[in-house]
Amino acid sequence: MAENGTISVEELKRLLEQWNLVIGFIFLAWIMLLQFAYSNRNRFLYIIKLVFLWLLWPVTLACFVLAAVYRINWVTGGIAIAMACIVGLMWLSYFVASFRLFARTRSMWSFNPETNILLNVPLRGTILTRPLMESELVIGAVIIRGHLRMAGHSLGRCDIKDLPKEITVATSRTLSYYKLGASQRVGTDSGFAAYNRYRIGNYKLNTDHSGSNDNIALLVQ
């Protein structure tokens, strides 16, 4: 350590040599999360990624608050206060949007920090909800050897004749309806179908699915 409290080049080089292995593992973990942590690929890594994203908000806010409290000068203190306010408002808007989406879908996927778009598929007497990165005009459904995949998500076993007549895509502000259009069976247990968006409005999902698959949304009054 130099006399003025700074770290010399040799000391910095020694620290890097000692911590190279740990730094390598940290970067490898980030690479795995960024490259493989998708909801339709590896659910375990995806959950870890979501936990990291959730923790980044309070940690970032705490860093700016501490930077404002223990400011170097008034300029850095002012910047830290401004950034703390911005991060706080962004975090608050995330919670507002998440609770609005939860009120619409009753799904814990509503608190996903990566996206606020949810696909809702009524299947086998229940509604399967999965996250989407964007809302499309057409959503494809593929059945391969009796297993249904929709928008990249595996939804379990299903025959093409048992596909729901209607699915929805929910955001914090709207609920979009998609109607089953063209469908084609391929072989005995495979096939494909397309759902076309035909209506959008301020609705909430009808989680009571004991009746018909056709009525899966209720108008928000």
From Swiss-Prot:
<keyword id="KW-1133">Transmembrane helix</keyword>
<keyword id="KW-1043">Host membrane</keyword>
<feature type="topological domain" description="Intravirion">
    <location>
        <begin position="100"/>
        <end position="221"/>
    </location>
</feature>
<feature type="transmembrane region" description="Helical">
    <location>
        <begin position="19"/>
        <end position="39"/>
    </location>
</feature>
<keyword id="KW-0472">Membrane</keyword>
<comment type="function">
    <text>Component of the viral envelope that plays a central role in virus morphogenesis and assembly via its interactions with other viral proteins.</text>
</comment>
<keyword id="KW-0325">Glycoprotein</keyword>
<keyword id="KW-0812">Transmembrane</keyword>
<feature type="topological domain" description="Intravirion">
    <location>
        <begin position="40"/>
        <end position="49"/>
    </location>
</feature>
<keyword id="KW-1040">Host Golgi apparatus</keyword>
<keyword id="KW-0899">Viral immunoevasion</keyword>
<keyword id="KW-0468">Viral matrix protein</keyword>
<dbReference type="Pfam" id="PF01635">
    <property type="entry name" value="CoV_M"/>
</dbReference>
<dbReference type="GO" id="GO:0019031">
    <property type="term" value="C:viral envelope"/>
</dbReference>
<comment type="subunit">
    <text>Homomultimer. Interacts with envelope E protein in the budding compartment of the host cell, which is located between endoplasmic reticulum and the Golgi complex. Forms a complex with HE and S proteins. Interacts with nucleocapsid N protein. This interaction probably participates in RNA packaging into the virus.</text>
</comment>
<dbReference type="GO" id="GO:0039660">
    <property type="term" value="F:structural constituent of virion"/>
</dbReference>
<keyword id="KW-0946">Virion</keyword>
<feature type="topological domain" description="Virion surface">
    <location>
        <begin position="71"/>
        <end position="78"/>
    </location>
</feature>
<dbReference type="InterPro" id="IPR044361">
    <property type="entry name" value="M_SARS-like-CoV"/>
</dbReference>
<keyword id="KW-0261">Viral envelope protein</keyword>
<protein>
    <recommendedName>
        <fullName>Membrane protein</fullName>
    </recommendedName>
</protein>
<dbReference type="InterPro" id="IPR002574">
    <property type="entry name" value="M_CoV"/>
</dbReference>
<feature type="topological domain" description="Virion surface">
    <location>
        <begin position="1"/>
        <end position="18"/>
    </location>
</feature>
<dbReference type="GO" id="GO:0016020">
    <property type="term" value="C:membrane"/>
</dbReference>
<keyword id="KW-0945">Host-virus interaction</keyword>
<dbReference type="GO" id="GO:0044178">
    <property type="term" value="C:host cell Golgi membrane"/>
</dbReference>
<comment type="similarity">
    <text>Belongs to the betacoronaviruses M protein family.</text>
</comment>
<feature type="transmembrane region" description="Helical">
    <location>
        <begin position="50"/>
        <end position="70"/>
    </location>
</feature>
<dbReference type="GO" id="GO:0055036">
    <property type="term" value="C:virion membrane"/>
</dbReference>
<feature type="transmembrane region" description="Helical">
    <location>
        <begin position="79"/>
        <end position="99"/>
    </location>
</feature>
